[in-house]
Amino acid sequence: MPTARDALLDAAFAALGNRPWTAIRMVEVAAAAGVSRQTLYNEFHSKDGLAAALIRRESEAYLVGVDQVLAAAARDGGDAGECFAAAAGWTLRNARRSPLIRGALTGGRAQRPPLPDLAGALRTRVTDVLVREFPRLRPDDVAWACEAALRLTVSYVITPAPTDEDACLRVAQLVRSLLSWPAN
């Protein structure tokens, strides 16, 4: 059985799927969670507090998933392209599922609630894993390839490929191409 806090976060997330944050009312979130409005305010203090907790939960879950798919791809012997493709696939699935993740990746920083820089966190995580797993690659080259692959991945969030597999294949090809190009 979920705690009141989890039920409230779930209700707020569900409401966000139907309308913008500015249109969501605290009384509706409390009712959907099956708790009183006072319980909501005791837990989060304000609508901004609820938003911050929801963003934190979604962001942390997304980034934990990125770490898991990167580790699995590396453990399975994937090359740098396959590792980033795994992160791209996770990103595409989560961007479809969560308006918060989608907004944070596509530049929704002017939105209410304010969103974190998930693209930067994704770029850093993938770059760190690839530099560690593939020590023969130059860190600057890896960082540049990850920047380009991230931009391609975000473009697929905005304008989807026919399938996620197609998008991930293109991301993997891009990373491989950039990392095999002779350095100057």
Positions of PLM-derived features:
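C-terminal peripheral helix-coil segments that are non-catalytic and often amphipathic
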Residues: 124-132, 136, 143, 152-184
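Alpha-helical DNA-contacting segments of helix-turn-helix folds
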Residues: 16, 51-58, 66, 118
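Hydrophobic alpha-helical connector segments
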Residues: 53, 64-97
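Amphipathic alpha-helical packing segments from all-alpha helical-bundle domains
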Residues: 60-63, 103, 110-136, 140-147
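Amphipathic alpha-helical segments used for helix-helix packing
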Residues: 85-119
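Short hydrophobic clusters on alpha-helical segments that form packing/core surfaces
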Residues: 8-16, 62, 66, 91
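Basic, helix-initiating cap at the start of DNA-binding domains
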Residues: 1-32, 49-52, 74
